[in-house]
């Protein structure tokens, strides 16, 4: 295997360096992000389907069509000389300022064996295959002037990590198939949810129009800047107290949120990086129920702080969410961020449900009157949406835990 493009790294080495599982949809997400960053206004995604199961004639076997590849075509800037230079370097710095890690294209090869890239800039035509045997010499460039720029990338041959048959000689081994189900509406929802913040910012801040067309056979779905979810915003700043310079770093955090009334719609509450979902809110700030059961609350917290601290796979933080100690790598632990976030969430809730505070106080008083021996623990309840049953249940748990600690500390003689 050649190493000319990566100096000390082979592509195999790079793929082995990823510590976390790569979701099957990651290449699709990465290429959409790349197209948007290349200023594309129109992105067409043609998803190919494994039709092998349609040949099965047994009516007792449920046929599940799955995605086995896709082609994405955009009208962005094309594969420029800077892009080519960046493509041949592991962890390139080209897009670091917008939260990119410089490794996204390598996650493609965890999912697909073969990737074909074709592109036209204003003055150059580029074509090459990207696979585990890729080298810089594989890139074919030709001078070609054109007013029409585009990039076309085709993904095929799913790796055995995501699709493989069990070894018949190993009884406990099972078939593996982690490919996306070919449900075009579900895939549209997946993309819309993942890029909820990014789509909103492109539309509101950059004032850009865009259209993403999804196709599976004769089916099609469209995502545009006209039908994206509108979001409200609140923000706060946190000082990096480990920064002892004359001008210590303040990090800005933006909470994007909205209420929806679609019962069938899943609500999203997540930390974000580079406009993309990274990790769900921890339990201390998560809102799982509202005074009105027909309303959902979506919340997405974004910050440069998160942009700088995500894994290479870009699907989690590079620090533990349970860390409470400040370090040079993680100077603002998540618990500190959440403490700043809590009053913002309470403010959002009270704006929507102005009686919430008095209703909560009433529930606490009723709980104390019903079980006065739990008064101390009832008053410690920090839930934002209180119900009598839940408050009493949590207070009972705290009471029993304290009682058990007392018994263990003073054992009977």
Regions found by a protein language model. Name each.
Residues 5-30:
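Conserved short strand/loop->alpha-helix "switch" segment adjacent to the catalytic nucleotide/phosphoryl-transfer site
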Residues 31, 83-87, 107-111, 187-190, ...:
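Alpha-helical scaffold elements adjacent to nucleotide-binding pockets in ATP/GTP-utilizing enzyme cores
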Residues 35, 39, 115-119, 195-199, ...:
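A generic secondary-structure signal for well-formed alpha-helical elements
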Residues 38, 103-135:
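Conserved glycine-/histidine-rich ATP-lid loop and adjacent helix of the Bergerat-fold HATPase_c
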